[in-house]
Curated annotation (Swiss-Prot):
Organism: Rattus norvegicus
Compositionally biased spans, kind Low complexity: 609-619
Record note on quaternary structure: Oligomeric complex composed of two heavy chains and two light chains.
Residues that bear Phosphothreonine: T612
Protein name: Kinesin light chain 4
Extent of Acidic residues compositional bias: 179-188
Lineage of source species: Eukaryota, Metazoa, Chordata, Craniata, Vertebrata
Name of encoding gene: Klc4
Record key words, sorted: Acetylation, Coiled coil, Cytoplasm, Cytoskeleton, Microtubule, Motor protein, Phosphoprotein, Repeat, TPR repeat
Length: 619
């Protein structure tokens, strides 16, 4: 054994051992030392036995003791060598660990340097965009101050505001309002389209707890319009779910629904429909064909087909969703009524009015039984049914439904219907009768203004829409005075709480005179179901305004001064060139009129204000 140990030292003097060779030699020497230690231990035990025998016989005891001492010293040296070898091995292991940590830290430093450079570039770009935005904001603030002053003059153009809003509603793509996504509905049904996404529900399939935080984050980004963040976040989460849970897991279907919702908000209906088809196949295979989540996915897919104008393809999907919900929830569940509303709207776009009436009437009966007559869904469904009646020319049935909506809203607000508290439509018809029985020269027939003024309180967008639609129906019947009463009430309710000047001027305008206007609404219709409030009626009418709105001479002087100041301001903001008509910022009607060099002079008596006529013609 000693020869083995000594043999390890017979290396050339000029040769340098590597770390691996040193470690190998150290392990080999350690094994040799352990063997030598075992041999010495055995010899020492033998000598101890010999000493015991010699003590009994009394022979050469000293020599044996000397051998034992030598063996003990050798064993101590061997143990020292073993401990040193163990220290060397532990040190080598520690150095290896430190080296690997050092390599990791170097890689992390390189990555952080790259990220720091990227952040510096992003910061520089953001600072440039911020500088441009601040310049634009400063320019817009100057124009805003001027337009705020112009807005105060437009209190005389309230009729023009009403016409502009209705023309805008008629030109709007109705499909954006026709099909609210089922995932946007909550119990109150009062969220707008941007806010509805933030309250997204999964229609019978609750989002798993581990996905809820991610879902809320994605919806928040989508509501802010930050799709460049929401879409990659959804895709990354979808890839992680597919890798960990498999493509056929229900959570993957939930994530596909969320991504489809984001694409839907971006008007990418094809991509959203593709994702919903994948989610539908997953849910059918994992949850069963009759699960409520399958019904929700079918409904959302039908919604997307409807937005693309594929009503025939959407109808069987919606019909199947209705059958599932009737089977799972029962025929009188509110979700069944929502599905009936969707199916009715699809049939309405295909001209199947008998089916539309049947579905709306059944949905209305469910809402009244399950939620009560005061639930907002009841008023919305009645509004949609009335729109269907109007399309078929059933004006008396539509008028009855509109009056029921307004009467119910009045009862909720005032508690009863009596001589002191009448619904707004009763006031409108009374004013119509008074306008026919009295001539305008005999005096102002609106001394009772305060009575119907109190009935104008409207707290629901559905009621506001009903006011406009019933007013349109009155105009078609030639009841111009009643129509204007309802339209003024609807306009007041839209401005209530947002335009204090308009609130204080309603009574003054009615006291000065009753300016009627010629109105014409486009052929398009817009109805919101399952949480929508808009219902623009497809009605055309024309009326000859006999009232006049006198303008004072001081207002003409103000407009002369305003013309000069506005021209200077526009030249200052945009140079010598005039503002193009296609500007993204909507200008005040009065300013548009003043900047036209060939505009006709102001008339002293007309049904519509000059600024409103110009605004309507330019749009």
């Amino acid at each position: 054994m000693s020869g083995l140990v000594l043999g390890q030292r017979d290396e050339p003097a000029g040769h340098r051992l590597s770390q691996e060779e040193i470690l190998g030699s150290t392990r080999l020497v350690s094994q040799g030392l352990e063997s030598l230690h075992s041999e010495h231990q055995a010899v020492l035990q033998s000598l101890s036995h010999t000493i015991e025998c010699l003590q009994q016989g009394g022979h050469e005891e000293g020599l044996v003791h000397e051998k034992a001492r030598q063996l003990r010293r050798s064993m101590e040296n061997i143990e020292l060598g073993l401990s040193e070898a163990q220290v060397m091995l532990a040190l080598a292991s520690h150095l290896s660990t430190v080296e690997s940590e050092k390599q990791k830290l170097r890689a992390q430093v390189r990555r952080l340097c790259q990220e720091n450079q990227w952040l510096r570039d992003e910061l520089a770009g953001t600072q440039q965009r911020l500088q441009r935005s601040e310049q634009a904001v400063a320019q817009l603030e100057e124009e805003k101050k001027h337009l705020e002053f112009l807005r105060q003059l437009r209190q005389y153009d309230e009729d023009g505001h009403s016409m502009e809003e209705k023309e805008g509603d008629a030109s709007k793509d109705s499909l954006d309002d026709l099909f609210p996504n089922e995932e946007e509905e909550d119990s109150s049904n009062d969220l707008s389209r941007g806010q509805g996404a933030a309250a997204a529900q999964q229609g019978g399939y609750e989002i798993p707890a581990r996905l809820r935080t991610l879902h809320n984050l994605v919806i928040q980004y989508a509501a802010q319009g930050r799709y460049e963040v929401a879409v990659p976040l959804c895709k990354q989460a979808l890839e992680d779910l597919e890798r960990t849970s498999g493509r056929g897991h229900p959570d993957v279907a939930t994530m596909l629904n969320i991504l489809a919702l984001v694409y839907r908000d971006q008007n990418k209906y094809k991509e959203a429909a593709h994702l919903l088809n994948d989610a539908l196949s997953i849910r059918e295979s994992t949850l069963g064909r009759d699960h409520p989540a399958v019904a929700a996915t079918l409904n959302n897919l039908a919604v997307l087909y409807g937005k693309r104008g594929k009503y025939k393809e959407a109808e069987p999907l919606c019909q199947r969703a209705l059958e599932i919900r009737e089977k799972v929830l029962g025929t009188d569940h509110p979700d069944v009524a929502k599905q009936l509303n969707n199916l009715a709207l699809l049939c309405q776009n295909q001209g199947k009015y008998e089916a539309v009436e049947r579905y709306y009437q059944r949905a209305l009966a469910i809402y009244e039984r399950q939620l009560g007559p005061d639930n907002p869904n009841v008023a919305r469904t009645k509004n949609n049914l009335a729109s269907c009646y109007l399309k078929q020319g059933k004006y008396s049935e539509a008028e009855t439904l509109y009056k029921e909506i307004l009467t119910r809203a009045h009862v909720q607000e005032f508690g009863s219907v009596d001589d002191d508290h009448k619904p707004i439509w009763m006031h409108a018809e009374e004013r119509e009768e008074m306008s026919r029985s009295r001539s305008r020269e005999s005096g102002t027939p609106y001394a009772e203004y305060g009575g119907w003024y109190k009935a104008c309180r409207v707290s629901s967008p559905t009621v506001n829409t009903t006011l406009r639609n019933l007013g349109a129906l009155y105009r078609r019947q030639g009841k111009l005075e009643a129509a204007e009463t309802l339209e003024e009430c609807a306009l007041r309710s839209r401005k209530q709480g947002t335009d204090p000047i308009s609130q204080t001027k309603v009574a003054e305008l009615l006291g000065e005179g009753d300016g009627r206007k010629t109105m014409q609404e486009g052929p398009g219709d817009s109805v919101k179901f399952e949480g929508g409030e808009d219902a623009s009626v497809a009605v055309e009418w024309s009326g000859d305004g006999s009232g006049t709105l006198q303008r004072s001479g001081s207002l003409g002087k103000i407009r002369d001064v305003l013309r000069r100041s506005s021209e200077l301001l526009v030249r200052k903001l945009q140079g010598t060139e005039p503002r193009p008509s296609s500007s993204n910022m909507k200008r005040a009607a009065s300013l548009n009129y003043l900047n036209q060099p060939n505009a006709a002079p102001l008339q002293t008596s007309r049904g519509l204000s000059a600024s409103t006529v110009d605004l309507s013609s330019s749009s």
